[in-house]
Amino acid sequence: MRSDILIDGLPAAPDDLAHQALVNYGAYTSFRVENGAARGLDLHLARLDRAAVDLFGESPGEAEFRRLMAVAVAGRDACWLRLSLFSPEIGHRAPSYIGRPKVMTVASPPPPPLAASVRVTALTHCRPTPHLKHVATMDLTRARRAAREKGFDDALFIDAEGWVSEGTLWNVGFLRDDAVTWPQAPMLAGVTQALIAQGLDQVGVSQQTRPVRLDEVATFDGAFLCNSATPVCPVTAIDDVAFAGRPALLGRLEAAWASSPPQPI
């Protein structure tokens, strides 16, 4: 299956593609679409709308997002859809433009989950403007490279005082008995994390959100990561702290995620 790139619903022009390659300013969201629907679509669109106002001063609006998504996925039973916001009026020497951004849609084959399990290493880092899912992602790739050079799969971010926030491409949750603890810290509010949280009561799992220090992770029974491509994946180690897989509980977390039905585009 090929990838199709459209900008405002039309074939992408070379100038617009060149601008995005040269000016790293914008926001995006991405998710799996099946039969014209996606889980957490309302959350994805609300977050993208807020990012548009934050970065450009104006948003195309939900109706336009939905129109462009429908054009992008037409004729596809399943795909991975990315919506990116950018403005050719904004550049390194001309940063002041305020107005509606353009919307690039990329429909491509659905990716596999990140992994069946991961071992991660803690890295002191905080993403710039962490509440935004922005296109400045060099630091995330660099962190993953650094983790793999140390023999791990990925990196878990902590601040200078040792407080846990998020992973490179994912949110993290910690397990103790039949409860989930979400770290409280500056981070991107993940849609998959929100869907799991919404469904935990239905599967008999309690939850709390509070600050979590790296030096207390050994007191938990387990950990997991989540993002749009990987609803639930066990974290089997954080540096030298090893965790059991807890497959039964992780299955309940995935059931919590699945309890939110796909929403039509």
Locations of regions flagged by a protein language model:
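Helix-start/capping segments and mature chain N-termini
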Residues: 1-71, 86, 91-265
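Short secondary-structure junctions
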Residues: 73-80
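Phosphate/pyrophosphate-binding loop motifs in nucleotide- or prenyl diphosphate-using proteins
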Residues: 83
